[in-house]
């Protein structure tokens, strides 16, 4: 009865941090299906409870429960001392957070959209990312910058940009790009516990998607190591490397390609800085073909970096076809729905590129 009650809460989308914690406790012997939103909420709850130095700061994160309800129930549970609402001023949010981190606290700085992290980029890169190096290792800046990254639905140019490649470019930060619930939970908890800056690039569409959470991942001490990709779908004919919501696009494409007898290996990067190139390289050596999939623009993108590394490595000699990329179109994001769809990678785009790489019709 208790199990059924918990599952009803999950199905109805009424799970608060407290309810999810109770569900995990009661169903510890089995796998849970929860949304990415709830996985992040539970991870925040557990880390704030675990360490008195951890606090959440951002716009509408407290009394409103967060713009995407990631912080639902946390202000009521922990109060103003741990959950800080701020004015709409990303520069001040980032600067205050970096100062707090330099003075012994462990802030989780939420940007309602990573598009507006650019308002605080000086603090993120010049202060947080460089302090450890500039101090010859004497200073640590234990801070998490997190928020919705990339396109959602109908939010146009100024809320749709994918900043993965921007932050991947910068030394001094770790950059994680979760896909499913275990990614979101394990990487966020690892980020909070890290002694230097971590940028968590989440996806708004994924927030509402449900994924299984294994008994192991339900543990309050579950963390995922940085720089460890996951083979989301094993295969032998071609390697598809992707991240965040691009993994979902790639998996749908792989299902379609399987109908034609093409067996795709789909790699979920999970983290782009550090990048698990070894997993990519081993897969390319096995399949002898590579396609990358990302939502960001093509110039200087994640796929371009992976392509360069494969070309510069001994995996290049194993390739039986060109390295091809599926990316967002090189334009500011349109608002009109048909144009927005056309500007983003779709499963059909991946199918087409895989067949081109394999030289099949």
UniProtKB/Swiss-Prot annotation:
It catalyses: N(6)-[(R)-lipoyl]-L-lysyl-[protein] + pyruvate + H(+) = N(6)-[(R)-S(8)-acetyldihydrolipoyl]-L-lysyl-[protein] + CO2. Its EC number is 1.2.4.1. Gene3D superfamilies: 3.40.50.920, 3.40.50.970. It is found in: Mitochondrion matrix. Thiamine diphosphate binds at residue 90. It is an enzyme of class 1 (oxidoreductase). One of its GO terms (cellular component) is mitochondrial matrix. Keywords: Carbohydrate metabolism, Glucose metabolism, Metal-binding, Mitochondrion, Oxidoreductase, Potassium, Pyruvate, Thiamine pyrophosphate, Transit peptide, Tricarboxylic acid cycle. Its cofactor is thiamine diphosphate. K(+) binds at residues 143, 191-192, 194, 196. It comes from the Eukaryota. One of its GO terms (molecular function) is metal ion binding. One of its GO terms (biological process) is glucose metabolic process. Transmembrane segments: none annotated. Residues 1-27 form a transit peptide. The keyword Oxidoreductase applies. Heterotetramer of two PDHA1 and two PDHB subunits. The heterotetramer interacts with DLAT, and is part of the multimeric pyruvate dehydrogenase complex that contains multiple copies of pyruvate dehydrogenase (E1), dihydrolipoamide acetyltransferase (DLAT, E2) and lipoamide dehydrogenase (DLD, E3). The pyruvate dehydrogenase complex catalyzes the overall conversion of pyruvate to acetyl-CoA and CO(2), and thereby links the glycolytic pathway to the tricarboxylic cycle. This is Pyruvate dehydrogenase E1 component subunit beta, mitochondrial. It comes from Ascaris suum (Pig roundworm).
